[in-house]
Amino acid sequence: MRTLKSLVIVSAALLPFSATAFAADAIQEQPPVPAPVEVAPQYSWAGGYTGLYLGYGWNKAKTSTVGSIKPDDWKAGAFAGWNFQQDQIVYGVEGNAGYSWAKKSKDGLEVKQGFEGSLRARVGYDLNPVMPYLTAGIAGSQIKLNNGLDDESKFRVGWTAGAGLEAKLTDNILGRVEYRYTQYGNKLDTQDIRVGIGYKF
């Protein structure tokens, strides 16, 4: 009887320690709360932009008197456009206007290119922070022929197509490199490489 009474007293004395240990185990078993992760905002190509370009053109002019002439030289100008974006697809419209210093003479006939411009559609794929793109549209250029006696200047209209790579340099500054092929009817073909820098609004 005394033994049973002793067991009851010992059990009662150990009960608070058992409850404390159980509570500690319950607290330790709770999983840690993960720290919040900050997600960087996704860059968007959508919106308006404008910029300047510098390039070099390799041209081929066709004449009825001396055959083909290849006037090559530098060109420069400005561009502006507007982009829309849906997921990773970027599309929009862009125009450019500039001047080409291409000029060459052959057998007394001089061919000279002057003002040039285009209005094009663009479609690209967002590979943040760069975007490869394709472009195509209508183009026009001033072409002047001079044989020493007559000076003929005409504005030729044709088509243009090309591809490029645009890169985000900062949140508002863009850089690009572009190849374009342009055909002004059957009188002049041009191929040029352009580099540009732009500002995104």
Curated annotation (Swiss-Prot):
UniProt keyword terms in alphabetical order: Cell outer membrane, Membrane, Signal, Transmembrane, Transmembrane beta strand
GO biological process terms on file: symbiont-mediated perturbation of host transcription
Signal peptide interval: 1-23
Subcellular location(s) per record: Cell outer membrane
InterPro entries reported in the protein's UniProt record: OMP-like (IPR051692), OMP/PagP_b-brl (IPR011250), OMP_b-brl (IPR027385)
GO cellular component, one term: cell outer membrane
Primary location: membrane
This protein's domain notes: Has a C-terminal deletion compared to that of other Brucella species.
PANTHER family: BLL7405 PROTEIN
Family per record: Belongs to the Omp25/RopB family.
Full protein name: 25 kDa outer-membrane immunogenic protein
Organism in which the protein naturally occurs: Brucella ovis (strain ATCC 25840 / 63/290 / NCTC 10512)
Gene name tied to this protein: omp25
